[in-house]
């Protein structure tokens, strides 16, 4: 499943292609993909202009609105800050901007954007005018310049949802999302781990932190030297602050590498990520630790396959 770095990368590679364009047509090819109480035809009737793109947890958000530059001819890929202090971010036709775009309009029924949950195999690609949908295309968005934005999803677990005040109030997943790890100070981060649950289970819990999945939980715990099954409440505050730094570092490193491509993930330009080449533990059970040479072990933590080094991760 695409995690925070992968969704962030899709956002920054999609923005130069679609920001400033209007959506003039929507075709839903798989009814189960379009979720919520606002129909696709209702969104299409607005011919909304894509003002910007942002991310919340593992969700990619298209924001509607007037004003700002047009995306015509803008092909530069947006660079990403290397410091967590520069977040939150959103991407527009003029490039990368700081701040947060609002999703709730003055009226609860005002549609202010779209949310894409990529889940296991969701992808977003822009194609030339007249391109026919593929076998796994679930929703087509026709843009005012003739190009087409396809939401492809092999497994059909992904979702698209129109956003407005009335929808956000009813969407439990949205209301329960925890804070963004790249926007937290170490003390606030550490305070989220007072539970008796395993620290990895807490990292994966989207109500504790938004956007972290199996890859970056394993990688950050290794870098912090913490055993995945350790109870959150048993870990000293200074160790949790180390985990905060490790998680921040690994997320930013992965974003700079355009995420991790293991099976299905691609950027919005069709490129593969490269961070999988830097894994210390994820997917490497039985191999030798790159730090100490000990054979890596595997276990089930929070119902997920987990890889760790028994020597480097002692807590």
Give, region by region, the residue ranges found by the protein language model:
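Catalytic cores of large soluble enzymes that bind and process phosphate-bearing ligands
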Residues: 2, 6, 181, 239
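Basic, nucleic-acid-binding surfaces and adjacent catalytic neighborhoods in DNA/RNA-processing proteins
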Residues: 22-48, 54, 59, 66, ...
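Gly/Gly-Pro- and Ser/Thr-rich, intrinsically disordered tail segments characteristic of DNA damage-repair
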Residues: 1-158
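Phosphate/anion-contacting hairpin/loop surfaces
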Residues: 91, 99-223, 231
């Amino acid at each position: 499943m695409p995690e925070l770095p992968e969704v962030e990368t899709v956002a920054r590679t999609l923005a130069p292609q679609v920001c400033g364009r209007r959506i003039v047509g929507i075709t839903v090819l798989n009814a189960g993909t379009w979720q919520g109480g606002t129909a696709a035809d209702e969104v299409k009737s607005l011919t909304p202009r894509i003002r910007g793109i942002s991310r919340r947890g593992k969700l990619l958000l298209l924001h509607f609105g007037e004003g700002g530059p047009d995306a015509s001819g803008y092909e530069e890929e947006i660079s990403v800050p290397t410091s967590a202090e520069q977040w939150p971010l959103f991407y527009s036709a003029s490039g990368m901007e700081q701040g947060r775009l609002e999703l709730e309009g003055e009226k609860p029924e005002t549609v202010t954007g779209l949310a894409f949950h990529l889940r296991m195999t969701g992808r977003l690609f822009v194609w030339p005018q007249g391109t026919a949908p593929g076998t796994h295309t679930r929703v087509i968005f026709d843009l005012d310049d003739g190009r087409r934005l396809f939401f492809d999803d092999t497994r059909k677990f992904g979702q698209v949802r129109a956003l407005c005040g009335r929808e956000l109030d009813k969407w439990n997943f949205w209301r329960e999302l925890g804070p963004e790890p790249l926007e937290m100070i170490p003390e606030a981060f550490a305070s989220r781990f007072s539970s008796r649950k395993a620290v990895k289970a807490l990292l994966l819990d989207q109500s504790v932190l938004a956007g972290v999945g199996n890859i970056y939980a394993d990688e950050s715990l290794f870098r912090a030297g913490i055993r995945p099954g350790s109870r959150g409440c048993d870990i000293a505050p200074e160790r949790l602050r180390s985990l905060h730094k490790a998680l921040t570092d690994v997320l930013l490193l992965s974003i700079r590498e355009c995420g991790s491509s293991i099976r299905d993930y691609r950027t919005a330009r069709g490129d593969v990520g490269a961070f999988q080449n830097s894994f210390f533990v994820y997917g490497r059970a039985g191999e030798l630790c790159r730090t100490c040479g000990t054979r890596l072990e595997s276990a089930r933590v929070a119902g997920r396959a987990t890889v760790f080094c028994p020597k480097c991760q002692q807590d």
